[in-house]
UniProtKB/Swiss-Prot annotation:
This is Asparagine--tRNA ligase. GO terms for cellular component: cytoplasm. It is found in: Cytoplasm. NCBIfam families: asnS, PRK03932.1, PRK05159.1. InterPro entries: Aa-tRNA-synt_II (IPR004364), aa-tRNA-synth_II (IPR006195), aa-tRNA-synth_II/BPL/LPL (IPR045864), Asn-tRNA-ligase (IPR004522), Asp/Asn-tRNA-synth_IIb (IPR002312), NA-bd_OB-fold (IPR012340), NA-bd_OB_tRNA (IPR004365). One of its GO terms (molecular function) is catalytic activity, acting on a protein. It comes from the Bacteria. One of its GO terms (biological process) is asparaginyl-tRNA aminoacylation. It holds the Pfam family tRNA-synt_2. It is an enzyme of class 6 (ligase). It comes from Staphylococcus epidermidis (strain ATCC 35984 / DSM 28319 / BCRC 17069 / CCUG 31568 / BM 3577 / RP62A). Belongs to the class-II aminoacyl-tRNA synthetase family. Homodimer. It catalyses: tRNA(Asn) + L-asparagine + ATP = L-asparaginyl-tRNA(Asn) + AMP + diphosphate + H(+).
Amino acid sequence: MKTTIKQAKKHLNQEVTIGAWLTNKRSSGKIAFLQLRDGTGFMQGVVVKSEVDEETFQLAKDITQESSLYITGTITEDNRSDLGYEMQVKSIEIVHEAHDYPITPKNHGTEFLMDHRHLWLRSKKQHAVMKIRNEIIRATYEFFNENGFTKIDPPILTASAPEGTSELFHTKYFDEDAFLSQSGQLYMEAAAMAHGRVFSFGPTFRAEKSKTRRHLIEFWMIEPEMAFTNHAESLEIQEQYVSHIVQSVLNHCQLELKALDRDTTKLEKVATPFPRISYDDAIEFLKKEGFDDIEWGEDFGAPHETAIANHYDLPVFITNYPTKIKPFYMQPNPDNEDTVLCADLIAPEGYGEIIGGSERINDLELLEQRINEHELDEESYSYYLDLRRYGSVPHSGFGLGLERTVAWISGVEHVRETSPFPRLLNRLYP
């Protein structure tokens, strides 16, 4: 009977065959231990010399790391294993014998591992990170489908930038200029006027020359937009969404979290409502904490965000930033005209901002004024202005960065490990 490592627990005390790769092995004179993986999980195969023919035992001792094989044996309980079971091997069939595998069980430097990213993905920890990423994506679709959102796919090639920055990847679009999308937000606002609640999930590109552990050049974003929704209501959706994906990972990825040595007690504390602190109060807090490198009207850096998040030890919303440091489309704060109705969600443990969101300007004249203040080409935003001409409504939205969220939940130090093939400032290969 052919099965997988994950499904093998259904076949205790039965003989099965599994297609797998050998990740590692050790042997003595009478027994060989084979560490196996098949994409669904990792399992130990035990080859006892007295219970197999001489050829099979010799094969178990000689087989090379990452060779592919069909392995047949009986699934037995093993309380020492994370899975709770292992295989007592009866026979081994080589599918392909691997050459000298470059990533050995010893430690390797980061550059070496990134040069061999196509192989590094096979390791137990990298496998765990990708499984957690997959669960976050699955839970994302689940949450938005259950809450009445329609999935919309905005274009990746665009003629304008929603953030109003120059850090864009430029390309020729026949006889016109085009840019790789920084965000699908403006198109999602248009879709929200048709469908009410919408979300997108896709790649975004930012030509930022940043080399921090939080930045990628190409990354994936989840961008919901909601008609007839104010800023406070949007914050509630955001915290419900983040709580949902954290709980989903806790429910479905315990083996992966264990493989990463993740302290899950920190994740178990994540529950709504999240704490909120205004930008003004955050500045005051930082001053009291001894930060003298930040003044009102300046954006927070990583040390500032970390200090604020550590104070709460939970995801925390920083609300109502100064107008001058935020994009042109954000709705003014009626209680303070120098700030806008926005919030950044800061993840704990030093992972920084994972969500940026705001209520959007719904008044045509004000939006035109802001576009001019930011010295943007009004013609490029004519379709966006149309949304305020024909049935404009209060509406809000946000964007969640997938890779930073994966980094926080999985507990990995650098965001490069959360993308299967990360694009960094000096890395376009593999």
